[in-house]
Regions:
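Metallo-beta-lactamase
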Residues: 10-144, 180-247, 268-275, 326-346, 350
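Catalytic core of the metallo-beta-lactamase
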Residues: 102-110, 206-267, 284-291
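Acidic/histidine-rich helix-loop elements
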Residues: 120-137, 220-227, 278-287, 314
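A short acidic, amphipathic alpha-helical/loop segment
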Residues: 164-169, 190-191, 256-260
């Protein structure tokens, strides 16, 4: 009997270990990002990228958060509320921003159409049947997009790098894609081509005098459990004849805001994240909160800012309307600078 019981325990342990090893092997093969190979820099140690300032919480902190979550309210929005079809092109010195959802915006400037972190999928997850799902439809129908010339992908998290959407854009529009180091190989693995990868402060040149510079952000990267920080993360500055536009991607607070503002002054418009910031003890290193977004507006010297990264996916403990409420309080406390909250699908010409 003792030997039989021992055999059962050993068999169960072997099955558990085998299952864990199997899951690890599957996630490495199908989900993990390929490793970047390049020279050591102040933000790459030869194996993994890092922030110039402290980066992200430990796995233990993540488990603590998961065990003690206090989620804010996220009501359902079952009926899509699509905005009007954007104009085909915008020129004559105009700058038009359309907020589509989450960090997906359409930037139209100098007859060039640019998408940031495009996401039209129902879930932002390695699989289609589980993981964070959207609480409202994208504000613009995919088929209503104008011709897309350029796509900016800030990092490899699923709510920013949606390979299904990128494949659809490639098929329909054939845009150039600009992304930080290491992400081009990951995209090619998923059948997405025409991606140019750059390091912080490097610049890609496009039609109509448009340049795109990869700029620092304080964040991290991961597609699976085993590939933390193999690929770089970033923001972007679009430099056009009609002015500079800054898209922050995902970022915590850091000195990079002032540095970007100094290098690209004056910045005509900034797109700054305001959501997924609670609880602060956990999110603070990688996500600014609404008050810090207002601070970033001033540090960058922005003429106008637009809020992004809210109202679509419940990724932090903040509720759907908490970011807007907290942003309005911070704006009122700082003299109400020009910082816009657009409705999903709303487009607006900026000064």
């Amino acid at each position: 009997m003792f030997e039989y019981a021992l055999m059962r325990k050993t068999t169960k342990a072997a099955i558990a270990i085998g299952s864990a090893l199997g899951v690890a092997a599957i996630e490495r093969i199908f989900f993990a990002a390929p490793r970047w190979r390049g020279a050591v820099t102040d933000h790459f140690d030869g194996e993994r990228f890092r922030n110039r300032e402290d980066g992200w919480q430990s796995e233990g902190s993540f488990l603590k958060w998961m065990a003690n979550r206090e989620r804010g309210a996220w009501p359902e929005h079952p009926e899509p509320a699509y905005g009007p079809r954007p104009p085909e092109r915008v020129g004559d010195g105009r700058l038009r921003i359309t907020f589509i959802n989450h960090s997906t915006t359409l930037i139209q400037i100098d007859d060039v159409n640019i998408l940031t972190d495009p996401v039209w999928s129902e879930r932002v997850s390695p699989v289609s049947f589980a993981g964070p799902r959207r609480h409202r439809a994208p504000g613009i129908r995919f088929e209503d997009l104008p011709p897309i010339d350029l796509v900016l992908v800030s990092h490899n998290h699923y709510d920013h790098m949606d390979v299904a959407t990128l494949r659809a854009l490639q098929k329909r529009h054939r845009p150039a894609i600009v992304t930080p180091l290491g992400n081009a190989a990951l995209l090619r693995r998923h059948g997405v081509h025409d991606a140019f990868e750059l390091d912080w402060w490097e610049t890609a040149h496009h039609a109509n005098g448009i340049n795109t510079t990869i700029v620092p952000a304080r964040h991290f990267s991961a597609r699976a459990m085993s590939d933390r920080n193999r690929n770089l993360w970033s923001g972007f500055v679009i430099s056009a004849p009609s002015g500079h536009v800054y898209f922050a991607g995902d970022t915590g607070w850091g000195n990079h805001f002032a540095e970007i503002g100094k290098r690209f002054s004056p910045i005509r418009a900034t797109l700054l994240p305001i959501g997924s910031y609670m609880p602060r003890w956990f999110m603070q290193p990688a996500h600014i909160d609404p008050a810090q977004a207002v601070d970033a507006h001033f540090a960058l010297g922005a003429q106008t800012s637009v809020a992004v990264h809210f109202g679509t996916f419940a990724l932090g403990d903040d509720g759907e309307y908490d970011p807007i409420h907290d942003l309005n309080e911070a704006l009122a406390a700082n003299g109400n600078p020009p910082f816009l909250v657009l409705g999903q699908g709303e487009g607006r010409d900026l000064p």
